[in-house]
Amino acid sequence: MRVAIAVLLVAVAAAGERLHVDHYFTYEEMTQALKDLAKAHPDLARVESVGKSLEGRDLWAFTIANPKTGPEAEKAAMYIDGNIHGNEIQGSEICLYTIDMLLNEHGKDPYLTRLVDERVFYIIPCVNPDGRVAFMREPNSPHSSRGNRRPVDDDNDGLVDEDGPDDLDGDGAIRMMRVRDPEGDYKTSPTDPRMIVPREKFEKGEWRLYGSEGLDNDGDGEINEDPPGGIDLNRTFPSNWGPKSEQAGTGPYPLSEPETRAVAEWMVAHPNIASAQSYHNNGDLILRPPMIYDDDRVPREDLETYDAIAKRGKQLLPDYDYRQVFRGLYPVRGGEIDWTYTGLGVFSFTNEIWDLKQDVNGDGKQDEADWLAWNDTVLHGAWWKDWTPFDHPTLGKVEIGGWSKWALRIPPAWMLADVCHRNATFTLFHADAMARVEIGEAKVTVEGTTRRVRVALHNAGFLPTVSGQAEQAKIGAPDIATIEGTGLRVIAAGRVDADGIRVTPVLYRPARVEVPTVKGLSTVWLEWVVAGTGDAVVTFRSQRGGAARKVVRLQ
């Protein structure tokens, strides 16, 4: 019924008509929405498949760029993705909302118009389409299905995916299952009989909790020990990757899965990507790398940049906490934003979308009781099913109850507008902060038959043209400044020191000067000595800061 209603709500039409992100899109709806948006804005947008998922679904990448304001490759690009974990679906809706807002407000909203004109946006709304489809179509808990759909032998019995949770009561959800047992580890909560809590060591038990409802499908005496797939896609990226002995969910080798290999290869093929944002759930968190070590290995200037962007993020997302993953959450090997930062050298964030963070029942704590109270009052009990007796074929009398798959991690659809807008606005602020190179003042001094040309290379963005990590690890192409002209001979070149007087000479190829980086909102001066007259063209190309050109009259 939920999917049927959602289909009726899809509305994408001609240019200028907004996409209604007021429900959770099926994969088919998302595909159609992306195609319709690209068709409605052919001058600014295109959609392409960058690969196939394990089950053969297209991985859609959406590009927003204005060719009238310059070549795509000569603009800094913001990469955005969502739904790398199958059950973390709202990231896709934020991506759709962002696409729609940028396209349909272009020419209307001055800020968004400038972003589209100056920047490029590469957006992959759903990295894990198979996981999304499985979550939406099949019975699940709030925490499944997380990985892709690769069959895995979790219990090492030579079979794959043969003993997963079962929707025993047929209500479309995988809930919890308990058995009354005086030796069990749990008791009924004294504050709410729906909850069970750990008993004290000296107390008599009341319940044995079996976790998700299910059967012993393979007859090995265990329940739900080998559920369907798969590989945790956010454990398969190359940077700091680790095998199963070091963390659960990883694949046999880095980029072993078609989904993440396609995404990684596509990103590498777009070296103008200067920043990255990935949407997950949940917890109301703004996360940054590193994911496997502390900040003592991170260039200080990069930490300052991260902190400044996150400070603005806290204004836009006031309930969110800002944390470094390794220190503030838990270690992650092979994480996406660890690779985009340490491997590609681009500033990267993950937002963990949504949490309750309310003391709804006024007891001074924030726990499951608050979720129950909020569900009772705001959702009229829709997310919770009371414990119900069930005759289990091997366990006997059990009770099944608890949360639906739509609970705890995913905001109700009517909250999507606020969730999408705030997170999209944070990411667009990050995109606006990316480097943007300009050529400022050019001074020409005549010295006999030669000319001394001093030029200001300016970065109008807040981010540096090359991150400290990229500079330290020698990632990507260097920034290059050139001077050329008809009959022009370049004799010497140098970088002007901070005092504006001394010049550090460039020893090789003076017509082509490498610039290590231009910090945010800063200027670097270069100087050439040339022989020739007429016009010279100075060009400054930054792989992640764009390109600028200036014609200089040599007199």
Language model regions located:
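Low-complexity, intrinsically disordered segments enriched in Ser/Thr together with acidic residues
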Residues: E514-V537, S542-K550
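Short amphipathic, basic-aromatic surface patches that mediate peripheral association
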Residues: L457-E471
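Short glycine- and acidic-rich boundary segments immediately preceding or forming the N-terminal edge
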Residues: G16-D58
